[in-house]
Amino acid sequence: MSSMNFNPFQNWFEKPPNPVPSINFVSLADSFFPKSQSPNFASIGLPKFSKKSPKPETAGTDEPGPYKQIAEQFLWECENIPDYRHTPEVDKLLNEDPVFEKKENPSTEEIEAEQKWWESFRASPVVQFMTRAEEIADDMNKMELEDNDTPYRKEDKDYWRAIPHVPGFDGRPMPRKAIKSKEESDDKFWDFMKQFLFGLWGFRQRPYPPGRPIDVAQAIGYKRLEKRYYDFIMKTGGWWYKDRLGRSRGPCEIITLKTAYGAGIIDRDTFIWGEDMDEWAPIHMVYGLEPAIATWEVRLGAAATAFLHKLQKGIPPWVPLKGREPKTYKQLQKEAIESKKRDMAVLEANGGVWPGVRTPSHALFLWASGSELTTVLESDHMPNKFIPKQLRLELAKVIPGLRPWEVISIEQAMDQISYGGEWYREPLGTYTTGPPYIREWNRSVMRLFRIFYNLSVRVGQKLERTVPGFDTIMDKVQKDYDKRIARRMKRREEELREEDLKHYSGRTDEDEEEEEEEDDDSNSKKD
């Protein structure tokens, strides 16, 4: 039986030389009469003279294949972690003007010609009109922001003003509509409550414009919501959280979460899930959960644990960890917008595809686009994970519109694909209030309207044929209906006319109430 040696360093069982080797007369004689080198393994073959000369090796066999190149590239990226977001091409795209091209080293004549062109451009009546229109639009936007700078609940004023406005498509901040009166607050609350109960009981909810959702949180009050949810959370149990490896831990009671928080196992950015939650969410994004867990003694224990960890790593205690710097909402929004622009510049510089083979580990988190987690996750200090291309394709089929970096971990992705062949909630992307849902809702409403309309018409025709004098009664009902509609239209026109007069005169309901009170006082004095 033959055996082969795959060891590149001579024989498997070669005896190591002694410290002082003795004189070998056989090898000395062989040095004067050299012989052919015998192989280091037993072989059964033909004699020497029957062996063919070895074929020359081609130069192309040393080149790795495409899969080996991908594997080598992936291993190199895991070891070096290249930063594709800060390259000269990306910085150039961010710094250059999106409209005008900057010419390098222009001559004096070109500079003067450009200045003359700009002067003639600004002197154009059309350009001046458009410039004035933009100034008026800016002033109107500023007035609308000032008109909505105070929420309905006075205790939420600081929180309301600390949150920055979202920039709109035209670059101007979009104002958040503040609730002005108690009637409007009640309408918001009950409008939300009716649709909420419909969804709670399994019925379809009425669609609302995505740009103007029902702001029931402002009507109730943000601080009141914190307190109400705090009372509810203190009475409930059964929480699951994601550890630093992405595994689900639970169920846990509040006291268990407090212990984990004090020991540094979880923090305010840890993803958590409760029995009545639709998705995993960070602890600080769940109403009332962070105050229930991070009480003063728990925060004191967590600070002591963090202090010890900093001392072990040689970090000064007063220096915050990377990504944990205290920042305002405005700073977080600015960093998130700049990060998004840089990501888009990376895609533009690489033909619409993110470069490299390895998916960054911070990009595997579901809420990676959240401004509160951007600085933490972009540091890429978490365990390296890799989603193969085949799994990405399966995820794209199962979850429409899903991107690879919107998955918490491989474990969650496989759970979503093979959760016993069933979903424990509606598949992502199926329930929306966008245009398709609104079109379907309108079709259903029109179908019901046609059914009841045709039914009422046919019932009326049947009664007219069978009941004598029914047509006379219907004529009288129709005349009364027309008179009632005419009275309502006239009353509504008067109300609109009064509202226009109040708007142009600058009068408010409070002024009218004060005048009515003064009239009542004067009448009482006369009496």
Curated annotation (Swiss-Prot):
Modified positions (Deamidated asparagine) in chain numbering: N350
GO cellular component, one term: chloroplast
Keyword tRNA-binding: no
Location(s), subcellular: Plastid, Chloroplast inner membrane
Organelle transit peptide residues: 1-48
Biased composition, class Acidic residues, residue ranges: 509-521
An individual GO BP term: protein import into chloroplast stroma
Region ranges (Disordered): 43-67, 491-527
Quaternary structure and partners: Part of the Tic complex. Component of the 1-MD complex, composed of TIC20-I, TIC214, TIC100 and TIC56. Interacts with the translocating preproteins. Hydrolysis of ATP is essential for the formation of this complex. The 1-MD complex interacts with TIC21.
Entries under PANTHER family matching the protein: PROTEIN TIC 56, CHLOROPLASTIC (PTHR37755:SF1)
Protein name from the UniProt record: Protein TIC 56, chloroplastic
